[in-house]
Design a protein with these regions (language model features):
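Detector for the c-type heme attachment site
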Residues: 57-63, 107-108, 122, 142-143, ...
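Inter-heme linker and motif-flanking segments adjacent to c-type heme-binding CXXCH motifs
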Residues: 112-115, 143-152, 182-194
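Extracytoplasmic/secreted proteins, especially bacterial periplasmic and envelope-associated proteins
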Residues: 40, 44, 85, 97, ...
């Protein structure tokens, strides 16, 4: 009986240590220092935002929501996710972010506080964005008027509401490989591949 109890206590201790490790486990790489010096094109960034679904997912059109002010409900088998505010509001939106914060969020799915985003936000597809793509997107988002629409909390049950578990998911499944062109194909072919795969 004592041996069984010792095994149970050891198992609980290991589980607790593993949970604590995942909780404090840092994620995300710092974007290159040269990113901030790139001049972005707001027009090209607006094109990328439309192509990537930013506007469609972050605008609650059915309820007359402001462009990119979030609030769109995304119902899944894991629960309901609500898209966040991406306007330049400094409290509810991304107005207090730096371009480095923006790059980590879009390409790596990591918040400015270092927390992982749920993959309902399709950042695994956006990792292939170049630094110039990010600079252009950032320039476009900076033209969006600030809107104080509050972010709604996701409605998720156990265990999906335990965000720290996403760190294990990222390790197991997240593909962080960049886009590679095929030199044997045309520029248009490679552009099409980029659009389809990321």
């Amino acid at each position: 009986m004592r041996k069984l109890l010792a095994v149970a206590v050891s198992a609980l201790a290991l589980a607790g240590a593993g949970t604590a490790a995942m909780w404090i486990w840092p994620i995300g790489a710092q974007p290159p220092a040269t990113l901030a010096s790139l001049e972005g094109s707001a027009n090209r960034g607006a094109y990328l935002a439309r192509m990537s679904g930013c506007i469609a997912c972050h605008t609650d059109g059915e309820n007359a929501g402001a462009p990119l002010a979030g609030g769109l409900a995304l119902e899944t088998k894991f629960g309901t996710f609500f898209s966040p505010n991406l306007t330049m509001d400094e409290s509810e939106g991304i107005g207090a972010w730096s371009v480095e914060d923006f790059a980590k969020a879009v390409r790596q799915g990591v918040s400015p506080e270092g927390e992982p985003y749920y993959p309902a936000f399709p950042y695994p597809f956006y990792y292939k964005f170049s630094d110039q793509d990010i600079a252009d997107l950032w320039a476009a988002f900076q033209t969006v008027p600030a809107n104080p629409a509050a972010n709604e909390k996701h409605e998720l049950g156990l265990p999906y509401n335990m965000r720290f578990g996403l760190k294990a998911w990222r390790t197991a499944f997240l593909d962080m490989s960049g886009f590679e062109t095929n030199p044997e194909k045309s520029d248009n072919w490679n552009r099409g591949k980029f659009i389809v795969t990321g």
